[in-house]
Every structure is written in structure tokens, then in C-alpha cells.
Amino acid sequence: MVRNLRAVGAIVVGKTVTAELAMAHPGPTRNPWDLSRTSGGSSMGSAAAVAAGVVPLAIGSQTNGSVIRPAAFCGVVGFKPSFGRLSRDGMFVTSETLDQVGGFARSVRDVATLAAAMAGEPVERWWSDDRTPPKLAALRTGEWEHADDAVQKRFQADVDRLAAAGYPIAWPAPPPGLDDAQRVLRTIMLYEEARAMERDLRGRETLVSEIVRSHLADGAAIKDDFYREALRARQRLAEAFAPWATPYDAILTPATVGEAPTPETTGDPRFCTRWSLFGAPAIVIPSGLGPGRLPLGLQLVAAPGDDRRLLAAAAWCEVTLPPIGRPPL
């Protein structure tokens, strides 16, 4: 991946901070919009670096919400392609089933260019200049009640504005079982992370935080039968989601439950979980500021493999919604 970037002239500046082992324990990076707030996680340094103007592009990875959430908190574009669309060579993989490379930029076009470069492919495989209004759907999942008032109002305002500028936006009933995703992903993620780290940490457990030790202990306690059943459930849910999503260029959902929280946490990933579980492509674009003058984002997702359609839809939405400006650095 890095070789592909260098091959097209990218200048690699350095490594950014992540949450500890790309898990729950936050790193020291703060949010450029408010230094008393987190920049999310796990790819917190990448999102903050792009938001602060340190670099125009950055790489991240996502198991659950580690690209979409920090991008939303920092007011930049974050893109997680379909599972398997980008190579994981050289990546520290903790979940074979879920981990995916993603990227951050200040525009949808730039993040599409980044994805093409990482893939070693012509940008035309990812990007289209067609700005025909996309066919959109909007979805309130079972997690809707966890979103604060500002997120709910912002989401409805975004949907209304996009509908006024393009075609009517559908509100389809979600496919059955969608709200099981949280439980299924957690089982797979914890099981695989615990076993991925077992050899490296054996006898050196004190090198990691209590938060991570607890996380890995929970995963180690999951029985093989429960893990295999979770994999089967994932397959069933993904098979139901793909034909449901395919008629639409993108499905609109919230990205986070609220503005960036304080730095002892990386924030709640629940609005990312379903799409990560299904291997669906997801992108977040800045859509407004909340009551604390911190960014809120609009997430768009699509059927697995529909990355190019998703990026085109996101580009149309990006120019239709008002810009949020830059952080007050």
C-alpha cells in the first residue's frame, strides 16, 4: 500500500497516533476544534492531522468505527472501502473478519484519489465526474434513540436539504435482524483480537493498559461455538443487507451519537457497527456544527462492492450541503 502511494509521488511524512493497539484506550491526540475533546479512535492522529492541515491525506483502519468516527469528530472526510477492496499487506491485523484499510481527506474527490493510489489502480475505477443527483435512502436504525437531539435534528435537516436539491429520499424498512449487528460484531471482534494478540503479549501483559487487558480477557472467554455462530449470523445479515441496499446509490445514516466527547474515551461507534460487520463501504462528510461548535457528520453507506457509486453520491451531497469551515487553530 505504501509502495503504491510512493509510486504515484506521495510523500510519506510519518506515523500518526492511534488508540492503544487500535482498541479502546485513547491516545494523547486531541481534537483540533477543541483541545479539551477527543479526536476519536482508533485512527485519531490521522483524522486530527488532516483537520489541522498538517497533511492533506492520511491512512487509517477500521474494525468497528475507527475511520468514520474520528473523521466525523474532526470535521473531515473519512472513507472505509468495501471489505477486501484494499490490500492489508503491512497492516497490523487484529480481526481477520473485520479489519479494513481506510483514508482521510478534506474532500470526497481527494479521498477517492487516495483510495485509488493505495489500490494501485486508475482513479477512474473509484471516481466519476457525473453529478446527477443520486438515488438516496435514509435510515433510522434501532440506535436512533442513542443519538442526542443535535444529531437527530442535523440528520433530518441534511435529509430535507438533499431531498430538496435532488430526488425524493426513500425511508425503507430495514432488513430483518439489522439490530443484531452490535452483538454479532462484538463477539467476532473480541474473539479474534484476543487470539491475534495472545502470542505477542504472553508473559508481557503489564505492557498494556488495564482497559486493553480487560478487552482481551473478554475475548479470550468467548467459546469457539459462540464465535462460529456469530460468523454464521454475520453471513446471514450480510446476505440480507446487500440486495436491500443495492437499489440505492447510498443510504444516509448518522455517523456518531453526538459531538466529540472528552478525551478519556474515543466515543461511541454504534452508528458504524452494522456497516463494518457487513463489509459495506462507508463514508462520512462534514454536515454542520453542533451546539458546542464541534463538527457533526453525515454517514453514507452502500452495498458491498458499490464503492464507486457511493463516492459519487457522497460528492454530490458534499457540494449540496454547506461547508463547515476549518477548526479555529
Predicted regions and their residues:
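Short glycine/serine-rich loop segments
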Residues: 1-115, 278-297
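Conserved hydrophobic/aromatic pocket- or pore-lining residues that grip, position, or stack substrates
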Residues: 5, 27, 162, 197, ...
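General small-molecule cofactor/ligand-binding pocket signal
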Residues: 13, 126, 168-173, 283
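A short helix-breaking turn/cap at a secondary-structure junction
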Residues: 77-153, 157-158, 321-329
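Short helix-loop capping/hinge segments that flank enzyme active sites or metal/cofactor-binding pockets
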Residues: 133-135, 187-242, 286-297
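Acyltransferase
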Residues: 150-174, 198-203, 227, 231-248
